A protein has these predicted regions:
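Noncatalytic accessory or regulatory domains flanking protease catalytic cores in secreted, cell-surface
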Residues: 111-125, 130-132
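Beta-rich globular "head" domains
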Residues: 47-50, 54-105, 110, 131-138, ...
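N-terminal targeting/docking segments
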Residues: 9, 14, 19, 24, ...
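Repetitive, compositionally biased segments used for assembly/scaffolding
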Residues: 1-54
Length: 150
């Protein structure tokens, strides 16, 4: 229920436990209600989540998925049973990037200011797809590791 999920989202102990559980996260990413309840909190538990996502019995990993095209808005994997973990951002010095969780396309999970080259990313978690927006010019993207629930 959404009430139960809201209670979990309000507890750091509960959030840490579910983020670290491949079984829980597999079920959550298949539920729109559950994702909406935790979308604003899950990025704080990225390290626990990445450990859980390594469970190949529950998730399939696709590494190096590029999303974004300069100053365009690009959606990827919206409404799919996925978790997107941003790992890097490439820019040629003239575009700012934002990524939003696919569950609502409004919860900002990452902001990267314009830079030259590839910058490592160590924050952010998107649930049920991702939206990437660029502000500026024509080149750039965010690279994600995408985990799909089996």
């Amino acid at each position: 229920s959404s009430t139960a999920m809201s209670a979990i989202a309000g507890s750091s102990t509960a959030m840490s436990a579910i983020a670290g559980s491949s079984t829980a996260m597999s079920a959550i990413c298949k539920s729109t209600i559950a994702c909406k309840a935790i979308v604003a909190k899950i990025s704080s538990y990225r390290s626990e989540l990445i450990s859980a996502l390594a469970d190949t019995t529950r998730f399939t990993k696709t590494a190096g998925k590029d999303v974004g095209d300069g100053a365009k808005t690009i959606d990827d994997g919206i409404s799919t049973n996925t978790i997107y973990i941003p790992v890097s951002c490439y820019d040629d010095g003239d575009t700012d990037f934002n990524a939003y969780s696919g569950i609502d396309q409004t919860t900002n999970i990452l902001s990267v200011t314009r830079h030259s080259g590839t910058a490592s990313v160590t924050t952010g978690v998107a649930l049920r797809g991702v939206r990437v927006t660029g502000t500026g010019s024509s080149v750039g993207r965010i690279t994600f590791d995408v985990y799909t629930a089996k």
